[in-house]
């Protein structure tokens, strides 16, 4: 891992940026392993389901707690200078994160919000995949065209992710949960573990990134594009994307206000520094 750290500039904080992204991918690898193991269980039960799901939750909680390394741990001026050397690379291109999403929920829940109502859970992956939300997240703000970041990612991983989408239609976390005995599906520990997973992946983790983006990229008069050209103002906030893995576990009000309060509180505190 250390040998792979090859900064493109002489700014010390670029090493912080690279190192933390490596740490993130290591935790993603651990989370993926647990999700894949769950799908391979021949006799899935509540105990094994909770064991592995709680492991996934701990990995994400560790990442969320440690994200201050990114938010507070780099000099803004240095970041704005070395970031240009990283183009078109972006955290957006983490294929492991996309895999975690596919292993977590029905593909319909990952369809971009504006198109989700046009499909159903029974639609094949080939029909749903072209409208997965992140395909609309790395577009040029002025033209709406795909960025080089997105184009390169699609060329390298689209077929692999489509194949995985098909595989996960019956083996994602939600479908595995539905295979548990009815009594176990009502177990508070199981429900709370799923809800924690939903919040960790779809609220707290994206918002940690949003907090960092506001600190480094937001200005009072204009916003700077992210390293991969991601339209981060619309891509990161949960209230815009409404990515909810397990909507059946949440109340109407909870879904309507998904991530809203956290965003408003965090952004107010950060903007005070400008």
Feature locations, PLM:
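Surface-exposed peri-terminal alpha-helical interaction modules
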Residues: 1-274
